[in-house]
Amino acid sequence: MHYSYIIKSNDKFINVRDVLKSHFLVSTRLLNKLKKSKLIYLNNVPVTPSKPVLLQNSSSAIFIHNIPVTLDSPVLPGDKVSFSMDFDEDSSNIIPIKMNLNIVYEDESFLIINKPANLAVHPTSYHFTDTLSNGVKYYFDSINLHKKIRIVNRLDRNTSGLVIIAKNEYVQ
């Protein structure tokens, strides 16, 4: 999943960090994860976690507007700030179990399932392998999607209805 924004002349953004926090409403936690994963870009150039150190006789640092590309790099009208949510996440604590999931909607951000009654949403000590999360984990594995199970809303075990699963931390 890739998100981008082109700076307009009337925008009040100061730097890359400001665009991510103010326009995209990226949390500090997610910002740190994106920064460490090197998945933030200014004009398609990766943003480095901190100011790069130039070695003697080296020109390996990346510059835009004559400044190293970092979260504090200034943005100008026409600049494109983007980030990608294309990284794997560990959900190995959920055991994948094949289930007949009633998927009513799916796109690159969300999965919506019609949950039947008498099915727990999350594993517990009483329901460790017979939950909706176990079925979703199996489904994600079958489509080669390595993401955490992010339940947006929760229904009690005895309640049927639609359950929304976010496919990444940003849309959750």
Which residues does each PLM region occupy?
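RNA pseudouridine synthases
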Residues: 1-172
